[in-house]
Amino acid sequence: TPVTVTLSNGQVITVEAGKTQGSIDFQTPANDVYNNGSTVSVTIDSATGGNFEQLTPNPAAAVTTINDSIDTTTATLTANPSVTEGGVITYTVTLTNPAQTPVTVTLSNGQVITVEAGKTQGSIDFQTPANDVYNNGSTVSVTIDSATGGNFEQLTPNPTPAVTTINDSIDTTTATLTASPSV
């Protein structure tokens, strides 16, 4: 008669009469950007049938190692393309996958952006120098120095800088000539 084998994961294998083995497929967890591989361990909970005098399950576990393919999550920095002197540049970090834990991103200008768990973006403001009569605008280029956290397999900063043009607001300087009415 057939043998019914119940496994610790709830699955059941039937070994047909006259056969010595049976099998069943088990679906492993899907690949994602967070997991770093794992193992699956299954034992026999019970075995019945087969008209044996005594049917004793082997207590040893069948252990399978699930190899993980490393998936990359990228952190990209963006900013306003232009502001006027004295304006505010908003730097935004965008992740290609939501963070499971907070992500700390350190910028080349020393500022730090935190992307909260469950989110893909975080921002911080940078105050540009006030308008003055001497400077003629400039360009600010900022990159990501480091990015940590998120429980990602691999978190890679995009090396492309966030570039903002600081436009000069033209100030008029007036020169006045005065002379004494008599010499």
Where are these regions (language model features)?
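Short edge beta-strand/loop segments characteristic of extracellular beta-sandwich folds
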Residues: 90-96
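Short, solvent-exposed loop/linker segments at the N-terminal edge
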Residues: 81-87, 181-183
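Extracellular lectin-like interaction modules
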Residues: 24-27, 37, 64, 68-83, ...
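Short strand-edge motifs at loop-to-beta-strand transitions and within beta-strands
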Residues: 11, 20-24, 62, 111-113, ...
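Beta-strand-rich interaction surfaces with strong enrichment in secreted/lumenal proteins
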Residues: 11-15, 30, 111-115, 130
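Contiguous beta-strand segments of beta-sheet-rich domains
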Residues: 2-7, 21-49, 93, 101-106, ...
